[in-house]
């Protein structure tokens, strides 16, 4: 309303007042969070649980060593960031008993417990398994990220959470998740172009859109490929193909198969995108963009994921958040 220059003048005038000339030592107000002092003791005896293959796989993907000897970081894979009340209470108990009363939220919509004694890992895993949060594959392609979409955001165009649930089935195929180069990829989706689901920095990303079909509006997604936030960040390249929402999982499967079949030895997905070009992916996606006439056999295309009525775009003022 007043403009940046007038605002700057007001600040400079205020700083000439006597209160601004007084010396001030902020040391007494500084808060140092000494996590190590609250860390669980390494001398405590924990239960010894059978080392199953499932537990070993979880150890390899969800647990990292801390610099402090004897302590681990446990990454809890939270599907699409959703927790029910029982899970929330048990996670709080894990935090208090095994992690010094702390937990961190990651950009992958997961939880990270630091300062977990190595000897306590089996107990922690056993509790996580009892509340269905012991899945392996944290920060891998199976760790799909989605914003709330139309589930709760008024700016959402599509049900990105519904798509995320459907996507997990595709990327969890053994032939894909066991491929080292595919496993390290990331799939993210947003229910609108605002990008709260971080689709623009994913290896394969989507944002919600609307397609005009013969029978009316169809929920759809714009496709982005080749993004990355590992090391140097790069924004994904937008393809020219808009995919109906119900065809997106199949389209992702086709893109991954295309990459796996045509990559060079050790070639990561971003490098493959640079070499093959976006146009080659548009050819792969061409078979998934058709918008059929509306009839009893095609009605599913006109209904969004996790919905039961024909799609209609409805947007309003709202706040976006992962």
Can you name each region flagged by the protein language model?
Residues 1-322:
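Peripheral terminal and linker regions in Fe-S/redox and tRNA-modifying enzymes
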